[in-house]
Amino acid sequence: MITNLRRRTAMAAAGLGAALGLGILLVPTVDAHLANGSMSEVMMSEIAGLPIPPIIHYGAIAYAPSGASGKAWHQRTPARAEQVALEKCGDKTCKVVSRFTRCGAVAYNGSKYQGGTGLTRRAAEDDAVNRLEGGRIVNWACN
């Protein structure tokens, strides 16, 4: 009985030592990957043993007075979302009218485009129409 207890204790200590040894070996590798920017969020969270934090995506909708439009969603930064929306719009007079993380929409009243945002498509559409004080929805996007 004492022999089994000693054997289990020895195995537990060996397992703990091996885990610590692997941790010491992995830390320089993780630091090197982080310095190069090549470590993915998934790999980092697996190593840390923590849940993966939600990734925030950004979106934007751009319009020109001519009616030309462009939209972007699932972008990693607000600046990239605006850039993609403006590129897709393709008109020099395009302006971003809605910037969002969840949903965005654009309302038009015949003379002006107005953006809105919300947690859902419906909320974003309502926000755009309310900000314009009327009009109709002409575009929307959600991440």
From Swiss-Prot:
A Pfam family matched by this chain, by name?
A: DUF4189
* Record flagged with keyword Signal: yes
| Signal peptide range | 1-32
Query: Which InterPro entries does UniProt cross-reference here?
Result: DUF4189
Stimuli inducing this protein: A member of the dormancy regulon. Induced in response to reduced oxygen tension (hypoxia), low levels of nitric oxide (NO) and carbon monoxide (CO). It is hoped that this regulon will give insight into the latent, or dormant phase of infection.
Which keywords fit this entry according to its UniProt record? Signal
Family membership noted in the UniProt record: To M.tuberculosis Rv1269c.
What is the name of this protein?
A: Uncharacterized protein Rv1813c
Native organism is Mycobacterium tuberculosis (strain ATCC 25618 / H37Rv)
Show the taxonomic lineage: Bacteria, Bacillati, Actinomycetota, Actinomycetes, Mycobacteriales
